[in-house]
Amino acid sequence: MGEQQQQVERQPDLPPGFRFHPTDEEIITFYLAPKVVDSRGFCVAAIGEVDLNKCEPWDLPGKAKMNGEKEWYFYCQKDRKYPTGMRTNRATEAGYWKATGKDKEIFRNHHMLIGMKKTLVFYKGRAPKGDKTNWVMHEYRLADASPPPPPSSAEPPRQDDWAVCRIFHKSSGIKKPVPVAPHQVPAAANYQQQQQMAMASAGIIQVPMQMQMPSMSDQLQMLDDFSTTASLSLMAPPSYSTLPAGFPLQINSGAHPQQFVGNPSMYYHQQQQMDMAGGGFVVSEPSSLVVSPQDAADQNNNAADISSMACTMDAAIWKY
């Protein structure tokens, strides 16, 4: 019955939905400063007193006046490691509290310094080989800290001996990697890219191939290797001996193809020159000054036929 009554007295009478989440400035102004001025008379329903050197962090939620919260507030007095020193003893039976980072300054109205906030992390074991845990403490103290008094002094505790501590357990959630959509690459491009990456990893450098043209001396050497007869046969014009007499040359003119019938006498001189060249004789160029009467008549007739056809047809429709 007594424990149940004590539990009821510890719970503050707050309406449903209200939570105790003061700001840093509110903790210094409304909860720490009045406690320093009147440590015995000032009492807050949401903050209890505890000796942090005799309690492990996982036992503190059961000693808090506010249940069901994720952070717990306590008044505590600093335990000086040395009577004339400024260092605080922060060790417990299972481990110790270690300060981390730089103290944060707390201002009123953004210009008046009223307090400081220190962040500490709890380590299991003994320093300096303790195991870090997720228990974190924010220690609030007033900004005006005077030197500690002599041990023989009977003065009451100084204002920097009191502090408000906020304890909470930091969750260590593992962040899931964000899936990245694969980049769509064509098969041929992907294969070529993989080849380039494999060659680059193997230290192989790709150099573009350049075609080397033969020099002039090489070309002359190649010409010297051929005989006179072979060179003459290569330089001879194409043979028209396979063409029958009156071989028609067809000219496509849209939907009306026309045929041009050549005279076999036009190829007489060319055929004669090719036969002589094939026999190994050197043939001189035909003279343009001496023309037989029959050849002149044939050339005139062919020129007249061609000119008449060219006049009636568009040059853009000639196809070879």
UniProtKB/Swiss-Prot annotation:
Superkingdom of source: Eukaryota
UniProt keyword annotations, A-Z: DNA-binding, Endoplasmic reticulum, Nucleus, Transcription, Transcription regulation
UniProt source species: Oryza sativa subsp. indica (Rice)
GO CC annotation: endoplasmic reticulum; nucleus
Keyword Endoplasmic reticulum: yes
Upper lineage: Eukaryota, Viridiplantae, Streptophyta, Embryophyta, Tracheophyta
UniProt-recorded name of the protein: NAC domain-containing protein 20
Tissue: Expressed in developing seeds.
PANTHER family noted in UniProt: NAC DOMAIN-CONTAINING PROTEIN 87 (PTHR31744:SF92), PROTEIN CUP-SHAPED COTYLEDON 2-RELATED (PTHR31744)
Gene Ontology MF annotations: DNA binding; protein homodimerization activity
Residue ranges flagged as DNA-binding region: 114-176
A Pfam family annotated for this UniProt entry: NAM
Main location: nucleus
